[in-house]
Each structure stands twice: as structure tokens, then as C-alpha cells.
Amino acid sequence: MGGMPILKLYNTLTREKADFRPIDPQNVRMYVCGPTVYDYAHIGNARPIIVFDVLFRLLRHVYGADHVTYARNITDVDDKINARALRDYPGLPLNEAIRHVTEKTETQFLEDATVLGCLDPTVQPRATENIAGMIEIIEKLIAKGHAYEAEGEVLFDTRSMDDYGQLSKRNLDEQQAGARVAVEAHKKNPGDFVLWKLSAEHEPGWDSPWGRGRPGWHIECSAMSGRYLGDVFDIHGGGIDLIFPHHENEIAQSRCAHGTEVMANVWMHNGFLQVEGRKMSKSEGNFITIYELLHTEKFGGRKWPGEVLRLAMLMTHYREPIDFSIKRLEEAEHLLSKWPVYGDAAGEADPAVVTALADDLNTVAAIQALHALAQKASADSRHLGTFAASAALLGVVPKEVELDEAVVHEIDGRVRERLELLKAKNYAEADGIRADLLARGIQLKDGKDPETGERVTTWEVKRSQV
């Protein structure tokens, strides 16, 4: 880590930005809440995928790729999944229908993440593969007096924990139950939440000391993070909407089960996303999935490349709300068009880019530094390696464009036309053709044929779209 800047991260737990000190620099551990695979991920889901991928890249850069463990879960047991399975596959047994829904949705999510330029996390555990760990935690909570059985459910007793609410800073006396926690008469306290619930005969379920049932929402992440990262780990991330109740309840379960002061030392949350100034919702008609943005013409009448969506997300600091718009995508695409395609160029990342990212993932400043570097690299290819390493930290890779034969033929014709104009000393029109092609991302390079001495012109694509 010699010469590396100290990472400073904003911690929702303390409401402060502070130096990041990993528990073990040889094994830096991060957990991020992944998707519930009942429907394709929407563009709001894309933000944490991208944000924490940048953090993963930065941690690997600072501590070494072999010294960072990133776990992002797949929630594949949930009432929303059951409902979608019944709706989409009414003729199939429920378990088979659920498998169709979860496999299809998980596959699409992983494809989306790849197109958005995200590295694979170190581990991507599924909830259904960790039921035994959930049961073990619940047994510990009951034994320690933090959970109780009531009417076929096991619930966490929020009053049993002296400092419940440490993340959201909510007073338990004033607190209402979260949106996904039903307030019912059998609860000791309104904020008590389900750890385990019985399953009807047709519903998915697993044998447990409390009968055949399935886990509550929050216990899943406690079990998976604990299994792969330990009782206490370095960073827990997710969207700001997860602070309460999900992350608050994760903390309560894990701390009470393991007897620790914290679950994770640093809690990071990305801000909300709205679309064209309005909350994104199906009722507003502005609900857009990542798949639709990348593969259909639903937004702005065209398809958008993954690297454009990624850069558009990173043009706002991760903790700030983001207004997602066609204009924002166009701005990102325009910026990318001015960056060189670097191929297999190798080098060291620019300290200005690293320093910006080390300051609580300041991607805005990092992009500014990267753009300045892109201008240098475009003028002098000796800077391409530095640009390549710096762009890789952001995960933004300007793509070489594959042009169809008709476009290549048209560009070649324009180049020949310009050569004829230059021979005729009609420089104004020749310059006009150069400017037109440059506006489309086609850069011309004039030279001489070494054998004949005649003027020749070559061209190359310098942008992500022509």
C-alpha cells in the first residue's frame, strides 16, 4: 500500500466520513444486498450494482485483487417470487414454477451486470442454499431471549435489544413497523419482525424446529454475510431505501446472535433515483428495466450501450439523489465519444483518479481527471496506458465500434472525395468533410505513400457510436 492514499468513506452508522481501516488488510470483506429474483432489475437497481463495483475495483487496487472478498446475495425465496410464479406459470406445480422464475430472472440479472461492466463478486450466495445457517441463527436468538414463537411464527423481540435503531437513529417508542413487516396482535411490540414463518402445503418450505416453513426477509442476509465474511466484517452496502427496516434488522439479528458491538464497521448507502424529475413507478409509466434500456427503444426511442448507462450513473456522487434522463445519457455518450479506445495498452492508474475515488468514491472528480487524461492520450499515445488503467478503476471502457459494410463504404467514399478536393486546392470543402466525419467520431490522418509520394488518408473510429 506504499504511496496509496488513505481511503475515506462515509459511514451511515456514524454519519461521518472517516479513514477506512480494514479489520485485516489481507482479507478486506464487503457485503452488498443483491436482487430478489422475481422480476428483471430496474435502472434504480443498476445504481448499487455499479457503485459498489467501483468500490470493489478500488479496494482491489489498494489492497490487491487476492485480498478482497465481495459477497452479493441472490434472494430466491420470497412471497413476491411465489406470486409471480403463480401468475406466469399457472399450469405448473408451484416449486417448478418458482424455479422457472428465479432461474430466468437471475440469469438476466447477471447478464445485465456484465453489460454494465461489473466484475463478478467473489461469491454470490443464494438464500435457498443457506437455510441451515438461518435456522442456526434463529436458534441462538431464541436461546438468548431475543426471539419468541407466536402463532406459527418466530419473531425478533426488538425490546430485547438496548440500542435497536443504531443505524436509522429511530426511537423505538416512536417507530412504526417497516413496510414489509405486518403489525399483528400476536407481536409483543409493533416493530417485532418475522424470522421464520410456517408454509402452507403448496408453498415452498424447509423443515425446522418450529415446523415446515421459510425464512423472513432480513435473516437471509445475516446468514449469508456471516457464512462468507464472518460475524463482523468491513463494509456493508446497499440502497438508501434499505437502511430501515432491512439493514437495521440485519444488525439486530447478527449482533444479538453473535454478541458483537457491530455487524459491519462501515455502512454505505447510495441515494435515490428518479426518472425525468419524477419517482419511477409503473403507475407513472416511467418504470424501466436495465434490459429495456439496453435492448429496446423504450427510453428515448433507441437502445443505450452499457458503458453509457454506467458512466451516466457515475456522473453523480453516489450519496446524492440522481435524476435519470435522456439528457444525462446523451451527456455521458458525448463524453465517451471523446475518449480514446485503448485496446491492450497497459500502465499505472493516474494518481489524480485514484485520489478522487479514495475520497468517498468521488466519481465526479475522478471522471474530470479521467477526461483530462483522455485528452492527453488522444494527442499522445504514450499516455494510453495510464488512461487505460485509470478508466479500468471506474470500469468504463470506450468500445471499438463494429461498422457494417455500407457505413465503411460510405466513409471511404467521403475520404476519396476529400482527397479530390485537396488536389483541386478546394480546402474549405475538404475541411468541411473532415469536420463532418469528426462530428461522427471518425478521425482522419493524412500522410504520404512511401513508394509513390502521393497523399493518402487513413481513418479510425474514436467514439463509442458512429
Curated annotation (Swiss-Prot):
What residue range is the signal peptide? Answer: none
What name appears for this protein in its UniProt entry? Cysteine--tRNA ligase
Question: Where is the protein situated, by its record's location annotation?
Answer: Cytoplasm
Q: What class of enzyme is it?
A: ligase
The UniProt entry's GO biological process terms, in alphabetical order, are:
cysteinyl-tRNA aminoacylation
Q: Which reaction does it catalyse?
A: tRNA(Cys) + L-cysteine + ATP = L-cysteinyl-tRNA(Cys) + AMP + diphosphate
**How is the quaternary structure described?**
Monomer.
Q: How many cofactor units bind, and how?
A: Binds 1 zinc ion per subunit.
Motif segment ('KMSKS' region): 279-283
Could you tell me which InterPro entries the record lists for this protein?
Answer: Cys-tRNA-ligase (IPR015803), Cys-tRNA/MSH_ligase (IPR024909), Rossmann-like_a/b/a_fold (IPR014729), tRNA-synt_1_cat_dom (IPR032678), tRNAsynth_Ia_anticodon-bd (IPR009080)
Spell out the family assignment given in the record's similarity comment.
Belongs to the class-I aminoacyl-tRNA synthetase family.
Q: Where does ATP bind?
A: K282
Give the UniProt keywords, A-Z. Answer: Aminoacyl-tRNA synthetase, ATP-binding, Cytoplasm, Ligase, Metal-binding, Nucleotide-binding, Protein biosynthesis, Zinc
* Named cofactor requirement(s): Zn(2+)
One term of GO molecular function = ATP binding
| Organism superkingdom | Bacteria
Q: Aminoacyl-tRNA synthetase: is it a keyword of this entry?
A: yes
Keyword match Aminoacyl-tRNA synthetase: yes
Its EC number(s): 6.1.1.16
